[in-house]
């Protein structure tokens, strides 16, 4: 057999998804069309890969770091002309298909130890988004991270990540995934989320995006403090009070209580007054 004798490796954070119902929900969320080119991150033994190849997608390209799994995947899908495989670290290898074309959608069971860097690679940052956004990403993440991504203002898990991701994309829950859905089962619960990146014309303009990033870094360094204190280094008290009054926000609030739209308006207010330069 292609994967005979291969066991999940802790250093690669390997947990095989074996729940057929979850695999079906992932595929449904991807909404695969005949002209889609799919990028799969961390295919493992190919359970999801098999489902993707059974869809109408024109191509499926997978990136796998584990050399032994690469060998097994090549054997398992040797007769699939629409399948291509890249061995290497998804954080550094090219993510284009074998023929150089970009993928249209990403479907992945992401290794939990690289979630943050991989999200940035796939989506970019507010001030440096990817040039060609994917139509959608269906990602299996640790539940805690998924909750932060889709959190609402005022919730305990609302963070700078919540603001950034919600200004880059629309994020919705697909389904919860308990530990028993994996082999071996992880110690944490997981969740499948759907991320639909905003079109380039819907993104923040570069200067405004840079200023939002600067404000988020400043404010969320001390998320328990009131805005009056966290933004004290950004503006003198008098100007800060005037801007808050103009925007209708209270400086008694804490960073996690402001919506993404309010952070944008706060940054826009600074832009209009030209009161502070964003960090480089």
Swiss-Prot record:
SUPFAM superfamilies: S-adenosyl-L-methionine-dependent methyltransferases (SSF53335)
This protein's record includes keyword Transport: no
GO molecular function: 16S rRNA (adenine(1518)-N(6)/adenine(1519)-N(6))-dimethyltransferase activity; RNA binding
Organism of this sequence: Prochlorococcus marinus (strain MIT 9313)
Location in the cell: Cytoplasm
The protein's name: Ribosomal RNA small subunit methyltransferase A
NCBIfam families reported in the protein's UniProt record: ksgA
Binding-site residues for S-adenosyl-L-methionine, renumbered to this chain: 15, 17, 42, 64, 89, 109
Gene Ontology cellular-component annotations: cytosol
